[in-house]
Curated annotation (Swiss-Prot):
Subunit structure: Interacts with CCT5.
Modified residues (Phosphoserine): 295
Subcellular localization(s) per the UniProt record: Nucleus
Database matches in PANTHER family: TESTICULAR HAPLOID EXPRESSED GENE PROTEIN (PTHR15901:SF16)
InterPro entries given in the database record: SPMAP2-like, THEG
Protein name according to UniProt: Sperm microtubule associated protein 2
Keywords for this protein: Developmental protein, Differentiation, Nucleus, Phosphoprotein, Repeat, Spermatogenesis
Disulfide bond entries: none
Length: 379
């Protein structure tokens, strides 16, 4: 992109130079005046600074050293014929060296083609040296120095202020860990105090072993020859847990013969089927609706009648209960007779004896003769 810009900038002065040469050949005095004006503008340092400001900030590497610029001396004016021959010679040389860039100087000035070529080669050589340098590996562990580190400075094009950037590595560890080939395991450095604390104390050993020096307990002969009594054997037997939930239900609940021989009806089979879960909110919380019709009274009477017992039904026990002879000969005591009588329900105020008030239980108070003789206030 930079090369195309240089070519476009270079082609523009070439066209201007060609136009000036034609004007000079035709004898146009404006060509000579413009050439002289261009030469004065280039040689004038103030004009040159204004031109550089109009062109904008360029690459600082493309600027020529001050000694090279100072070494070039351009004549004030030249003869038109000599200037034309000089321009043709420079153009032929640029075509031979394949240089698309042409200086913006006027015809009356000497073109610094050799100086520009040397500066360009010098910049290329400097750029190649920068690219040839290996990149900095920030993952290598290095000690951070206390003095100024590596950095670079630049001048802001908008503000005339100096900026300085200090480059510190952002990572202070390395991905490769150095393997120690001398040791297979890590041996920590244990101090003498740590070794003393790691030894078990004698008090704890005696406490846990019940003051026994050996794990084999000595058993006396009397304990070996002792015969346990029946009570001790009964107490030594483990208790059977009375877990009702863990016992098999076949031993607890026995199905009767009538339940085994029962034949379910169609209604029972219908009720035994599981209901489908409701999906709508109205089904979960139904709103009671008024009955559209009155139920049949004859149907209710039919349902109220006792059903006849089926011949296949085998009851668990005889409906006629057998009364024992001992029960028939029992004589009831007066206490049992009093308890057998039902309580007589009375009304709310029937047979209720209210507790007498204090004024009703005591005699009415009487005033003393002294109080009777005293004059009453207000009379």
């Amino acid at each position: 992109m930079g090369d195309s810009r240089r070519r476009s900038l270079g082609n523009q002065p070439s066209s201007e130079a060609a136009g000036r040469s034609e004007r000079e050949q035709d004898g146009d005095p404006r060509g000579l005046q413009s050439s002289v004006y261009e030469s004065r503008r280039v040689t004038d340092p103030e004009r040159q600074d204004l031109d550089n400001a109009e062109l904008g900030p360029e690459d600082p590497e493309e600027e020529l050293p001050p000694e090279e610029v100072a070494g070039e001396e351009f004549p004030e004016t030249l003869d038109p014929k000599e200037a034309l021959s000089e321009l043709e010679r420079v153009l032929d040389k640029d075509l031979e060296e394949d240089i698309p860039e042409i200086s913006r100087l006027s015809i009356s000035q000497k073109l610094p083609s050799t100086t520009m070529t040397k500066a360009r080669k010098r910049r290329r050589r400097r750029r190649l040296m920068e690219l040839a340098e290996p990149k900095i590996n920030w993952q290598v562990l290095k000690d951070r120095k206390g003095r100024c580190g590596k950095g670079y400075a630049w001048i802001s094009p908008c503000k005339m202020s100096l900026h300085f950037c200090l480059c510190w590595p952002s990572v202070y560890w390395t991905e490769r860990f150095l393997e120690d080939t001398t040791l297979t395991i890590t041996v920590p450095a244990v101090s003498r105090r740590v070794e003393e604390l790691s030894r078990p104390k004698r008090f704890y050993l005696e406490y846990y072993n019940n003051n026994r020096t050996t794990p084999v307990w000595p058993i006396p002969r009397s304990s070996l020859e002792y015969r346990a009594s029946s009570r001790l054997k009964e107490l030594a037997a483990p208790k059977i847990r009375d877990n009702f939930w863990s016992m098999p239900m076949s031993e607890v609940s026995q199905v009767s013969r009538a339940a085994q021989m029962a034949v379910p009806s169609s209604r029972i089979l219908q009720l035994s089927k599981p209901k489908a879960p409701a999906t709508l909110l109205e089904e979960w919380d139904p709103v009671p609706k008024p009955k559209p019709h009155v139920s049949d009274h004859n149907r209710l009477l039919h349902l109220a009648r006792p059903k006849a017992q089926s011949d296949k039904c085998v009851p668990d026990r005889d409906p006629r209960w057998e009364v024992l002879d001992v029960t028939k000969k029992v004589v009831a005591s007066p206490r049992i007779i009093s308890l057998a009588k039902p309580k007589v329900r009375k009304g709310l105020n029937e047979g209720y004896d209210r507790r007498p008030l204090a004024s009703m239980s005591l005699p009415p108070p009487k005033a003393s003769p002294e109080k009777c003789d005293q004059p009453r206030p207000g009379l």
